[in-house]
Amino acid sequence: MKLHFMKYRKIAYVISGALVLLSVLSLLFRGLNYGIDFSGGISMEVTPIEEGYTIDKMRNQLSEFNPELQQVDGKSILIRLGLPKDATDAQQNERVSQIKNILGENVEYSQVQIVGPKIGGELVRGGILAILFAFVMMAIYVWIRYRGGYAVGAFVSLFLDFVLMFGFFSITGLEFNQTAIAVILTGIGYSINDKVVNYDRIDENVKKYHKMPMADLIDLSVNEMLRRTMLTSVSTLLAMVGIFLFGGAMLRDFALAMGFSIVMGTFTSIYISNMILYNFNLRDTDK
């Protein structure tokens, strides 16, 4: 069965435009929910020992520090609180000691993480540089490998992938940390590979079918690669579902964001990059 993807290209334009608009607006007015490793602060994962020691009781005890408390894995509780920008190492350690004294023997500590504001700022800069470097390198790779409509289509869809991934973190409020950087770079790498495979097949068919209309040729090429695309996407998504369900609270955000990047990467590979390519009329017979 042949699917006519180009028939619905205008709908795909509207969907992608709406997603980009939502992403940009969310980034402008809501921003990103920076994690402790970027914003600086204290993160503690604890498990109550005493019967009836609830998250509400813990929140009341720690109210003077204005913490964020989150239930994870049924029993464990994640405690997060910021630190003043000028906090010294001694002050940071003192704050941890104060919290431990308040909680007393009511909890067990699974993880304690302290990130100073200075280190957090350096990590933010490092993360931004990593993303910019990856984007530039991928853009150069695309430009060297392709020319004309191919390069423009891959470049625009690649940029769209970045915008949508940042928008996803902003809209959902998922913690933006070093893991998020890894998710974005991994997802974009997956997406650009998918685009290259599809473009290679289109390029082969352009040389093979000299008189076939461009829309039909793109549909043919996508259908020829669809089984490979779907097998790769579905198998990776199933792995993410497994991580989401059984990997614990610390991996759920990773699985959710990675799953979104796979879906969006597949969408932009099939529609956005190919729609832009279609508008370039690669052959004289298509004019």
Per-range role (PLM):
Residues M1-K287:
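A structural signal for conserved, well-ordered secondary-structure elements
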